[in-house]
């Protein structure tokens, strides 16, 4: 029996397979690690539905992880995963003093987590991360969440969910950064423009390359780096070569999160032409690293310092050229939110529900 300490259960589609896996959902793993570090008296348990591809429980930075090895294998497999999650939680509820559940994404984790919370009379919140606020999310009607049960990662996501489903999340909690992950040593900004993210159509790295081609007309020696992997890689390599930019753009192989942060601290601009985002963690990280951020949207109603919101590719090009043309561009660090504050704000919701006073 482990009734001597409160237990906090997190339901998430995937989770790092080990402590060396820094590329799997960087923000959720930073949140979980910081939560456990901040509150050592709290027993944090993670239920990972689809990944890792294993069913063997393991420990990760002091957190117990139960993987259910769903592997995104289809409807029957998904139903079996849900049944196993339900069974595991039933056993856990008998042995632990469960304070609440946190579901990442308004999807299957929210469906099962909300069901379990209502069944056992526990507080639960679902954290909207991005794509789950768009039209066509069948889980919204299945979960039927109340506004008070929803946390949006940004003002944009709160507005998007309300526009599509007439539900406005009562809470907005943004992703924080961990200052300890950044080097304190001042570094020369030898990279003009950096792009960070999966190489998928949604991220629009074809536009990134087009912008670099435009910048090269003013700055022929412009230096750009793309960090990411994905199905668009070969097509993007072809585009780089066809544009004659092979000397200007480095398309790196898979890069660790620590290496990405180091590259950000050496970069002048994060260029993020994605067509849709919730709150890109790379925005917060790049701003803290001292880079300016240029993109097509703002996650919050009021842009942060050094964040430039543009409406077209032409405006994006002009803003980038303008920043690179300045002799004394300000590269001071901008803190959007610390990860410690993010964790505290989430736990405050459960505290308000009486989870930690019972």
Label for each model-derived stretch:
Residues 1-53, 357-358:
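N-terminal subdomain of nucleotide-sugar transferases
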Residues 9-11, 186-203, 207-214, 225:
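Conserved donor-binding/catalytic core segment of Leloir-type glycosyltransferases
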Residues 26, 30-33, 198-217, 231-237:
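A conserved mid-protein helix/loop that constitutes part of the nucleotide-sugar donor-binding site
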Residues 156, 176:
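Carbohydrate-associated surface elements
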Residues 237-255:
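Nucleotide-activated donor-binding/catalytic signature segment of Leloir-type glycosyltransferases, i.e.
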Residues 254-255, 262-267:
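Short alpha-helical donor nucleotide-sugar binding micro-motif in glycosyltransferases
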Residues 275:
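Aromatic "clamp/platform" in nucleotide-sugar-dependent glycosyltransferases that forms part
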Residues 283, 288, 292-295:
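Short hydrophobic beta-strand element within catalytic cores of glycosyltransferases
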């Amino acid at each position: 029996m482990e009734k001597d300490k409160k237990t906090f259960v997190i339901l998430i589609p995937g989770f790092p397979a080990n402590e060396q896996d820094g590329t799997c959902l960087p923000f959720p793993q930073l949140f979980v690690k910081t939560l456990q570090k901040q509150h050592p008296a709290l027993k944090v348990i993670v239920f990972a539905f689809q990944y890792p591809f294993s069913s063997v429980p393991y420990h990760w930075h002091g957190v117990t992880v139960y993987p259910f090895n769903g592997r995104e294998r289809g409807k029957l497999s998904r139903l079996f995963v849900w049944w196993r999650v339900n069974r595991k939680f039933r056993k856990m509820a008998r042995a632990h003093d469960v304070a609440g559940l946190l579901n990442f994404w308004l999807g299957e984790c929210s469906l099962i987590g909300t069901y379990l919370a209502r069944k056992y009379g526990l507080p639960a919140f679902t954290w909207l991360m991005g794509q789950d606020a768009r039209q066509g999310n069948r889980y919204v009607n299945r979960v039927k969440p109340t506004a008070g049960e929803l946390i949006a990662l940004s003002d944009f996501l709160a507005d998007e969910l309300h526009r599509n489903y007439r539900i406005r999340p009562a809470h907005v909690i943004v992703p924080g950064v961990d200052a300890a992950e950044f080097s304190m040593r001042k570094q020369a900004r030898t990279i003009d423009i950096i792009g960070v993210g999966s190489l998928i159509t949604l991220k629009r790295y074809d536009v990134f390359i087009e912008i670099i081609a435009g910048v090269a007309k003013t700055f022929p020696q412009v230096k750009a780096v793309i960090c990411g992997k994905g199905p668009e890689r070969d097509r993007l390599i072809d585009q780089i070569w066809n544009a004659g930019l092979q000397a200007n753009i480095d398309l790196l192989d898979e890069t660790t999160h620590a290496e990405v942060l180091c590259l950000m601290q050496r970069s002048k601009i994060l260029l993020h032409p994605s067509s849709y985002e919730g709150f890109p963690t790379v925005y917060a990280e790049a701003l803290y690293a001292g880079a300016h951020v240029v993109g097509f949207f703002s996650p919050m109603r009021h842009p942060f310092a050094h964040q430039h919101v543009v409406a077209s590719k032409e405006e994006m090009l002009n803003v980038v050229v303008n920043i690179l043309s300045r002799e004394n561009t300000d590269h001071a660090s901008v803190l959007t939110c610390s990860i410690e504050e993010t964790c505290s704000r989430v736990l405050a919701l459960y505290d308000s529900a009486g989870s930690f006073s019972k």
